[in-house]
Amino acid sequence: IFEIPMGSHFRIHNGKIFKKIALRVKRYECLEISSGRLYLFQPNAEVELLPN
Protein backbone atom coordinates (compact mmCIF):
# COMPACT_ATOMS: atom_id res chain seq x y z
CA ILE A 1 0.00 0.00 0.00
CA PHE A 2 2.93 2.37 0.56
CA GLU A 3 3.68 2.34 -3.19
CA ILE A 4 0.31 3.66 -4.41
CA PRO A 5 -0.27 7.45 -4.64
CA MET A 6 -2.40 9.38 -2.13
CA GLY A 7 -6.04 9.74 -3.17
CA SER A 8 -6.04 6.62 -5.34
CA HIS A 9 -8.54 3.78 -5.04
CA PHE A 10 -7.57 0.19 -4.29
CA ARG A 11 -9.16 -3.18 -3.54
CA ILE A 12 -8.18 -5.64 -0.81
CA HIS A 13 -8.43 -9.46 -0.87
CA ASN A 14 -12.11 -9.58 0.19
CA GLY A 15 -13.25 -7.18 -2.57
CA LYS A 16 -13.78 -4.05 -0.47
CA ILE A 17 -12.74 -0.80 -2.17
CA PHE A 18 -10.89 1.95 -0.33
CA LYS A 19 -9.40 5.40 -0.98
CA LYS A 20 -5.97 6.18 0.47
CA ILE A 21 -6.19 9.43 2.47
CA ALA A 22 -3.30 10.09 4.85
CA LEU A 23 -0.33 8.70 6.77
CA ARG A 24 -0.83 8.39 10.55
CA VAL A 25 2.56 7.86 12.20
CA LYS A 26 3.31 4.43 10.63
CA ARG A 27 -0.07 3.33 9.25
CA TYR A 28 -2.16 4.63 6.35
CA GLU A 29 -5.65 6.01 6.91
CA CYS A 30 -8.06 4.82 4.23
CA LEU A 31 -11.75 5.46 3.58
CA GLU A 32 -14.02 2.56 2.63
CA ILE A 33 -16.07 3.78 -0.34
CA SER A 34 -19.28 1.81 0.34
CA SER A 35 -19.71 2.56 4.07
CA GLY A 36 -17.68 5.76 4.57
CA ARG A 37 -15.78 4.23 7.52
CA LEU A 38 -12.09 4.91 8.15
CA TYR A 39 -9.61 2.05 8.40
CA LEU A 40 -5.89 1.92 9.16
CA PHE A 41 -3.59 -0.22 7.02
CA GLN A 42 -0.05 -1.41 7.62
CA PRO A 43 2.34 -0.06 4.93
CA ASN A 44 3.19 -3.55 3.66
CA ALA A 45 -0.45 -4.63 3.10
CA GLU A 46 -0.89 -6.12 -0.38
CA VAL A 47 -3.62 -4.35 -2.36
CA GLU A 48 -4.77 -4.11 -5.97
CA LEU A 49 -4.63 -0.61 -7.49
CA LEU A 50 -7.80 0.37 -9.37
CA PRO A 51 -7.89 2.75 -12.37
CA ASN A 52 -9.81 5.94 -11.50
What positions do the PLM features span?
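Mixed-charge, Lys/Arg-rich low-complexity intrinsically disordered regions
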Residues: 1-5
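A broad helix-preferring feature
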Residues: 7-10, 30
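Short, isolated positions in well-ordered beta-strands
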Residues: 10, 17-18, 39
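Structural motif
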Residues: 13-14, 34
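Short beta-strand-centered aromatic/proline hotspots
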Residues: 15-25
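Short, solvent-exposed secondary-structure boundary/capping segments
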Residues: 26-35
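Intrinsically disordered, low-complexity, charged/polar segments
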Residues: 38-52
